[in-house]
Each structure stands twice: as structure tokens, then as C-alpha cells.
Amino acid sequence: SPALKKLGVKNRSRLFEIPPHIEYLTVKPHMKRYMQVSAEIYGVLLKYVAPEDVHVYSIDEYFIDSTPYLPLYKKTPRELAQMLLDAVLEATKIYATVGIGTNLFLAKVALDILAKHAPDFIGYLDESLFKETIWHHRPLTDIWQIGNGIANRLHKYGAYDLHGITMVPEAKLYKEFGVNAELIIDHAWGREPCTIA
């Protein structure tokens, strides 16, 4: 949790790694219930968008291509997001967050880094905002698809944020990461070639 992170406890720590002076509760997961609620939320979304425009990314995350729905509902992306958040809250009593982006990567980063700290639970990124707000964000491991292993390998080249990655010669990145360098480079520039379709 963010509170534990502030106390220096790393994400995905094992219980014995938590310092003894920190009080905490362990709560057993209720996967059956989580799956039921996830299905409820998915059902709410399908009242507003077609299944072919939704990609279920995980039990608690969805990508939605909202392009055809903006003119249909006569809403901006933020207004549509708020409409969906309100519908989910009304149906499930669960507060959700939304990341809006001009591509899947920017939407995911807007969710992970901006929305969870926004008062309205909505984060937005386009290519120019990405360079202003995310390009120099640290640590790299906050960025979607960059784990500790990849981050440590990037650190060898002096890259500690996405902007730093853009400064590394591409040939070095391809030598280090092979074909996976292409995605790392695209993401460093805020690009994402994949779509929901």
C-alpha cells in the first residue's frame, strides 16, 4: 500500500521482510468475491460500450476504446470517464479510477501514475502532457512493463527515467534487449503500436 511504501516497505515484500516495528494486518484474499465484483463492473461497462471495444486486462483493469462513444454520448473523454465512474459507483459502491490516453500506453500510465492521486480519480495523458509530466518521472519501475530487472539494465546506460532512455543510442538498447528494445523505445517516446482492435 502507499502507506507502507512511505515507511520503506517495498511492493510485494514477504511478511518476514517487513520491519517488526510496523503494525499491519494480513487479510486472506477472497478471489471468488473479487471475480464476482469484477463481473459486475464489466456488466456495468457493457451497458455503455460494446464488448468488442473493451479489453479485459486483469481482474480489476479494462481498456476501453471510447472513440465511437464520444459523439454518441456527446461527451468529452473526461466526461465519459466520469459517467462510467458514476455508474460503477452506483451499481457496486466501489470507487474506480480511470486513465485516459491517446494510446493504450498513455492510458495505462495515466491510470498508474496520475489517476490514483487525482481528486476526481481521472488521469489524462496525450503526447505533449506525457513529456511534461511523465518523461522525468522516477523510479522507472512505476512505468508499465518496466520491472526491476529491466530498470537495472537501463541504469547501466545512465537511464533513470523515460527521457533518459531516449538519450541511449538505439543500437545499444537493441544489443541489450533484442527485439524487446522496440517497445521500450516506443514507450520512452509515449508511443504504443497496439490497439484494442
Model regions: which residues?
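Gly/Gly-Pro- and Ser/Thr-rich, intrinsically disordered tail segments characteristic of DNA damage-repair
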Residues: 1-186, 194-196
